[in-house]
Amino acid sequence: MDAGRRRLVINDCMKPERGRRSPLPRRPTRPPDERSSGIGNLAMTPAKLHMTTSLAPIAVHSPYDGSLLGSVEATDPADIDRLLATARRGAEISRNLPRHKRASILEGAAQMVESRHDAFAEIIVREAGKTIVQARKEVLRCVNTLKLSAEEAKRNAGEIVPFDAYTGSEQRQGWFTRDPLGIITAITPYNDPLNLVAHKLGPAIAGGNAVMLKPSNLTPFSAIKLVGALREAGLPEEVITISHGDRELVTAMIAAREVRMVSFTGGFATGEAISRAAGLKKLAMELGGNAPVIVMNDCDFDKAVEGCVSGAFWAAGQNCIGAQRILIQSELYGRFRDAFVAATKKLKAGDPLQEDTDVGPMISKQVAERTEAAVNEAIKAGATLLCGNYREGSLYHPTVLEGTPLTCRLWHEEVFAPVVMLAPFDTLDKGIEMANDPDYSLHAGIFTNDLNVALEAANRIEVGGVMINDSSDYRFDAMPFGGFKYGSMGREGVRFAYEDMTQPKVVCINRG
């Protein structure tokens, strides 16, 4: 979900230039049969993590200064049969784990992540470029996601079926259980490299499945460290395998007949390709959005400005529910615009490890360059630049536009960058019409003190979630998360992902 909506297009995510200050400490070199797959204390043996190959390792660089952080071994697509054999064993082991054991593993991993909070946060900063403040919040969300998954493992086991509600079935009784699907392929993006992995692994483990995980090649170390915590908490090693590679590997991982579900978070082009290649499988797709926030004349003004600034520029705008289009009622437009621009100019962009940095780098210099090009295209089409559009390598300063033509690509496609567009509207009907304009829709927000207006907007805006008196980017990890229209298939949120990753089995006893 970078400029032009290519967040996890597989060809793009292999090659961007990356970096940070100093490499994370490395372990001593292991013997050839136990080569490290990661950096620092993230190393695992190939038998436990993935297959050793002769392919060139995948280098991982910091988005801030391009320095080398380490590398991961590439997985050869030709090894898919061996990978599947491991996953097959993992699925059998996982389905036979008692629910209390699945729950204790997830709870134990949550405690480990929490106790190693600073180490996890620093890895997120180094490989993803989030500010240290934002990285700490992601770690806390990961802990919560794992705890919610542990609770789901214990309570969502099925229901009694009232067979005697049907004439002629008075002597029948029974229930349905929620059984595992089996093998799930999970593909995760770079923008939330820890918590979005937890959102796939946690419910899958709770449901008794095995997972073939492919994290973004740009941010693999958060995922590796999380898998390490799960195994340390008692998860059998075969239950999760991690692979690193490109389009050919992903195609092999999703096309295999034994894979029963593909869970993907990323770009539209890749999502379409996956849906064509997957065949008869369950699909869970979170393909992004183009979030509108409506600001009404009667809103709490300071709260609206603060919420919209945060919603637009959190994580350098690399947030699928971040505010991209802020629609302001006409009487308030000039005042809001001036206050919003003034607040935006106060944001500090720079080194993400500094506590006072508000906006870190984008994931790569190439992505920042594409963002700059998209903004310049909008300006050429008639948009007015209010601030920003200044790039230093991968650091793209917060950018605000007004007067963006509604036919412009920037208006219709997901920006996935620290870029926001302001536009006035007269009536609520017009604001809702503008909010619903793009094809992509995850979240929206509205600021108003009129409950009837808020509920009218919530009813008519075509999105998966409407945040009232909040920016569009609010998310609680237990709620259903997904979009309307073209933007997604299925829902994340622990309970809802768990239900997607399990299948009902009916047991009926005839006592007659």
Curated annotation (Swiss-Prot):
Alphabetical list of Gene3D superfamilies matching this protein: Aldehyde Dehydrogenase, Chain A, domain 1, Aldehyde Dehydrogenase, Chain A, domain 2
Entry annotation: catalytic residues: 286, 320
Keyword Hydrolase annotated: no
Xref: PROSITE patterns: ALDEHYDE_DEHYDR_GLU (PS00687)
Chain intervals for the UniProt region annotation (Disordered): 14-41
Broadest EC class assigned to this enzyme: oxidoreductase
Chain residues that bind NADP(+): 266-271
Pfam families attached to this UniProt entry: Aldedh (PF00171)
PANTHER family hit by this protein: ALDEHYDE DEHYDROGENASE
Family the entry assigns: Belongs to the aldehyde dehydrogenase family.
Function: Could be a succinate-semialdehyde dehydrogenase (NADP(+)).
Record-given protein name: Putative aldehyde-dehydrogenase-like protein y4uC
Organism: Sinorhizobium fredii (strain NBRC 101917 / NGR234)
